[in-house]
Amino acid sequence: MTLQEEIIRQLGVKASIAPQEEIRKTVDFLKAYLRKHSFLKTYVLGISGGQDSTLAGKLAQMAIAELREETSDQAYQFIAVRLPYGVQTDEADAQKALAFIMPDQTLTINIKAAVDGQVEALQAAGVEISDFNKGNIKARQRMISQYAIAGQMAGAVIGTDHAAENITGFFTKFGDGGADILPLFRLNKRQGKALLKVLGADAALYEKVPTADLEDQKPGLADEVALGVTYQDIDDYLEGKLISKVAQATIEKWWHKGQHKRHLPITIFDDFWK
């Protein structure tokens, strides 16, 4: 088995999908998790205005709405959370995503004071924080807020990790990489886009340039620039297609580099890192 085949196997990616079937499968998955854990009544998800959180949010709201109808339990709720650092430059996209999702509840927590306070405390202790490192603090602070909400609201936190993100390790360890449930896992970027099209999302929500937008000194830095490879190449690779040797080498480099992010803390029994 080639490395490409092994990665595809681990991430569960299909070469082609039926969007309606994947929508149904995901909604049922989200419903089943809450039904199994009767002490949970809510899903919590940060909404950025990008493709991934828009899709995960819509599917979560659909699942919650069906659960309420099937059980007559009005305690089931989907809580969308806006988590800007100061003023988000593409706030209009976030509002457009919320209008599409129509969440039961929307909360806004501005993380700037918490992030800046942490950076200042570290600097006071003599630890200088790089802009890149500060970006990771932002991602982790967003998850702190979401788990605080989930803890108060009998909730589970939804993550937006998908195959095209997982393969490159393009997420913050214990930040956006930390969640209770990953409804998009197995889908690549173009497949997620296909689901949003079927769901009737505004094209602007899935055609916009993907960005983590975590670094102050590189605002709106495109994922593809940061990674050095296009999502088209990543998606093609995940679908078992041939791509250029340069693109393949870049993708596989990121796969190996991000391996530690796909595991729980390493124990003496682990050998994947050797």
UniProtKB/Swiss-Prot annotation:
Q: Which reaction does it catalyse?
A: deamido-NAD(+) + NH4(+) + ATP = AMP + diphosphate + NAD(+) + H(+)
Return the Pfam families for the record. NAD_synthase
Q: Which UniProt keywords apply?
A: ATP-binding, Ligase, Magnesium, Metal-binding, NAD, Nucleotide-binding
One MF term in GO for this entry?
metal ion binding
- Keyword Cell inner membrane assigned to the entry: answer is no
Task: Read off the InterPro entries from this record.
Answer: NAD/GMP_synthase, NAD_synthase, NH(3)-dep_NAD(+)_synth, Rossmann-like_a/b/a_fold
- Tell me which residues bind Mg(2+): 52, 165
Pathway the protein acts in: Cofactor biosynthesis; NAD(+) biosynthesis; NAD(+) from deamido-NAD(+) (ammonia route): step 1/1
An annotated GO cellular component of this protein is: cytoplasm
Q: Which residues are involved in binding ATP?
A: 46-53, 160, 189, 211
Q: Does the keyword ATP-binding apply?
A: yes
Q: What is its EC number?
A: 6.3.1.5
A Gene Ontology BP annotation from the UniProt entry:
NAD biosynthetic process
Q: Which family does it belong to?
A: Belongs to the NAD synthetase family.
Job of this protein = Catalyzes the ATP-dependent amidation of deamido-NAD to form NAD. Uses ammonia as a nitrogen source.
- Self-association or partners: how does it assemble? Homodimer.
The protein, known as: NH(3)-dependent NAD(+) synthetase
Q: Which organism is it from?
A: Streptococcus pyogenes serotype M3 (strain ATCC BAA-595 / MGAS315)
Gene name of this polypeptide: nadE
